[in-house]
Amino acid sequence: MQHAKPARRTHRRLLTPPLAQKNGIDPIQLVLPHPEELPEALAPGGRAPATIANYLIARFYPNDPQIIHSRFETGEVRLDDGTVLTTSSPYAPGERIWYFRELADEPELPSDMPVLYEDEHVLAIDKPHFLPTTPRGSYIAQTALTKLRVREGNPLLIPIHRLDRPTAGVLLFAKTVQARRPFQMMFQHRLVSKTYRAVAPVPADPTAAEQALSAEGLRVRSHIQKVRDVLQVRQLSETECVARGVEPNTLTTARILETFTPDPADAEAWGVEPGRPWGLYDLAPHTGKTHQLRAHLNLLGAPILGDVLYPRVLPDGPDRSEHPLQLLAYTLSFKHPITGEPISLRSGRTLGAWERKNSAVREAS
């Protein structure tokens, strides 16, 4: 009995696309599945589609075949070696093709990305809230990567690390193919010092609050696991880890630099109970798990202001531009892996919720 081969869509191999970028967007690559991998509707009786065009139309655009036809008409469906395919090109299982996806309408997102540092190897920018780092899901053109490739005229740009879409702050991009690996290894080996700023309630637990307000800060440990297709991470507190015999895999040092009790209207606007003091947090992650900082402050009973995932997932809706996640990638320091120069970067952005404190002080005076 022959087992079906798994469907394959390649992503990570460093192949040279046979199509140039279009408006900062790379073509996608797709390995044509074997008939036994396809549903009956695409391979009736176990027979492969007659042509590549038939397959692409049936799988992706059955209601608008002209989208695929137009790609073939403009020579924008190709093999690895650059061979231009036509609507009559036969379907060959295992063959890799390249083409441009059809872009859906995307809402216009912020484009202000001031340059914090640049040399011939690397570009550091100050990312705004709500702008994704890379194309993903419904955001393709409206991403930092796509916008920067167009703005800088550099199709080779790739991010060295990532920030969540709601998070603002310092973000690095490699400018050349040769620079990618040294900078990626720098992050992989944790040769980077990072701090974040956040605005969140002061922990209700007096001991946790006292430690967070101390010069040493509060060390938060937990075990975090990202579950596929689940928006929140799964997290065990340090106490739960001990009880279950599980090793913590995350560590953050959280220090509260200042506190401020907002007026009731501000508290209500941010979804925080009135009368509870807020803190300006300095967060130093010693590990780099998904949503680590957001999950750790939520674990303290002090979720970051503007968080739509913690403590509960809020319904989808338009971005709340007046109330973004109050999390900022504030500083990034490292020894340049190519030149050896010490580099220290700092975001020029501020957190809007904390600016309310400053405006309240000005109004009072």
Task: Indicate residue ranges for each PLM-predicted region.
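RNA pseudouridine synthases
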Residues: 1-365
